[in-house]
Amino acid sequence: FSTIEQLIEIKTDLWKAIKSFSNKNSGKIEPTYIVNLGNSLKQQFRIAEAIECYDLVNKFNLDIPQSWINRSETLIMLNQVSNTFSIQMLEQIKRGYENVLLSKQVPPIWLDHYKEQIVFHKSKISEACRDAGIEPNPLDSEKTKDEYDKLSSYRKFCLENNLSLSEHGLYCQCMGSSRDNLTIPTAGGIVGDFVIPMEMVLNRLKSEFSFSRHLYFEYLTTEKDYELLHDSCFSELFNDELLGIDVEKLRTAFRLCFGILDKIGIAICELFDLYPPNGNVYFQSFWQLDRDNRRELFDSNKSPGLIALYSIATDLNEKKDGELSFLKQLRNDLEHEFVVVYKSESPSDIYDSYKFMDNIVFIKEDEFLEHLRRILQLLLHQ
């Protein structure tokens, strides 16, 4: 935590650069900016988001070897942080280095190093297969596709949108990522006193996240119940506001996400005895690293997870110039203001129904959906 603020500033500048480039170029993205953002997130142990950045760039099939190199390094980091691995993880690490060798942008002096990495991970794959009593399968990617095709539409949705509570699902869409099997890691199989209470916390977080995620899925995939809407007898005001159970699914899902964040903050305070002086825990602001000796207290725990969580909190904190602080503001508006979700380009208001109040917040449906997807992914990455 002694140097985290410098990394936060770099991350914030990269977010701004990506946004500025997109605004000036009709929504396009600059791949090298995305790779640099991924590298910054990797340094802050935001592994899932870093992999997402590299995957996005690699889909363009451009000659950007840094993306493949750092994706492989991030998978190695995932192995080290989670103390778990799979043959598929080793395969993808190796494949990343193989793609690097195809690049024309790699200095010749580095080629031997990447060749050594390929040989090393080939041997690890052979060793893992031998320990598991299986033969290496050159058709493994086809098997993965077959397994994916057999998944439910809901589970496919979770994997396609990076919303699966599975470490395996970060890099593979096989049957092994078909369940939300995230657990509290216990290095070396040693179960400490904290593990059972933290599993209880994780159960609560998974339950609320799963509910929020399913509300999002239902809104996108379930046909609107017009009979139920009719039975609600809403007054027709011709003001384009979306009403009824369907849109309330979005509102509820969004609010739930911030409740989950605050519960994560409480769990951190309980686990590491890090409650702020006033005892109030709001995820984006309870850290208060510059008060008393709290930075040293956080630093003494040597936890990559804490660094990742603090980094995410700064994204949501307006006082830290957080790129996603508008999400927290939207949550506050949903709780305390009249928020109108509308579908058209701009809401009409024939009868001037919105003039009664000055502080009505308007948000277009597709923007709200994108914000909900973003906060759900942010939760997953914790």
Description of each model-found segment:
Residues 202-220, 239-272:
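Short, hydrophobic, well-ordered secondary-structure elements
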Residues 3, 7, 11-30, 58-64, ...:
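Flexible helix-coil transition and linker loops at the boundaries of alpha-helical arrays
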Residues 10, 50, 86-89, 93:
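Single-residue signature of alpha-solenoid repeat helices
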Residues 78, 86-91, 98-207, 241-247, ...:
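Acidic, Ser/Thr/Gly/Pro-rich intrinsically disordered interaction regions
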